[in-house]
UniProtKB/Swiss-Prot annotation:
The gene is udp. It comes from Escherichia coli (strain K12). It catalyses: uridine + phosphate = alpha-D-ribose 1-phosphate + uracil. GO terms for cellular component: cytosol; protein-containing complex. This is Uridine phosphorylase. Optimum pH is 7.3. Homohexamer.
Length: 253
């Protein structure tokens, strides 16, 4: 291995060809779909949850790299991409809304995240905000509006766990520990838009280290109405979110 290789992603700095912006979905299967909307897409590597492609926007290189689910694997992807020269990160995901007025198919742009994770504590104390970069947020909002997407901008709750941390009772035990009982109602009262599992780690890492990061998610379910999303709705919502993140990347290059 050359000295420029990183531990997990299977990449060298030369693979990036000078790219400074990365789009980071959680799902490895989403990477190729994103890269296909750009020019000259090429697969670079795939190892565990990390699948990486390179493509071009207006002649400039862009990296698309999956992070897997949750903060720990996200922190690995962000760290190693930063070592290789990435300075701007745009996360794209799907999400469950918790505000009644947010509809399935809407788009959420995160300005900051409630730090319900543990990984972000390895980068900054809890008092440090998990806040998105202003330029990234602006680019995502403008990109969403450019395709006519109904867009909401605000705070996201970012949890280590999908079930108890998001106060889900449709589980094997049906039990949620005392710490999280009633938590969703509190977040709703504070205007929190949604739950997901990566943004607290991403935003804390980047804000505390001089990197730029933004977050956009398509709403696949509203948890005030139901818990399980519709497969066709998921596909359509994902398609809109992918177009938005690519257009935002173009505006930031």
């Amino acid at each position: 291995m050359s000295k420029s290789d990183v531990f997990h992603l299977g990449l060298t700095k030369n693979d990036l060809q000078g790219a400074t912006l990365a789009i980071v979905p959680g799902d490895p299967d989403r990477v190729e779909k994103i890269a296909a909307l750009m020019d000259k897409p090429v697969k670079l590597a795939s190892h565990r949850e990390f699948t990486t492609w390179r493509a071009e926007l207006d002649g400039k290189p862009v990296i698309v790299c999956s992070t897997g689910i949750g903060g720990p694997s996200t922190s690995i992807a962000v760290e190693e991409l930063a070592q290789l020269g990435i300075r701007t990160f745009l996360r794209i995901g799907t999400t469950g809304a918790i505000q009644p007025h947010i509809n399935v198919g809407d788009v959420l742009v995160t300005t900051a995240s409630v730090r319900l994770d543990g990984a972000s504590l390895h980068f900054a104390p809890l008092e440090f905000p998990a806040v998105a970069d202003f330029e990234c947020t602006t680019a995502l909002v403008e990109a969403a509006k450019s395709i006519g997407a109904t867009t909401h901008v605000g705070v996201t709750a970012s949890s280590d766990t999908f079930y108890p941390g998001q106060e889900r009772y449709d589980t094997y035990s049906g039990r949620v520990v005392r710490h999280f009982k009633g938590s969703m109602e509190e977040w709703q009262a504070m205007g929190v838009m949604n739950y997901e599992m990566e943004s607290a780690t991403l935003l804390t890492m980047c804000a505390s280290q001089g990197l730029r990061a933004g977050m956009v998610a398509g709403v696949i379910v509203n948890r005030t109405q139901q818990e399980i999303p519709n497969a066709e709705t998921m596909k359509q919502t994902e398609s809109h979110a992918v177009k938005i993140v690519v257009e935002a990347a173009r505006r930031l290059l």
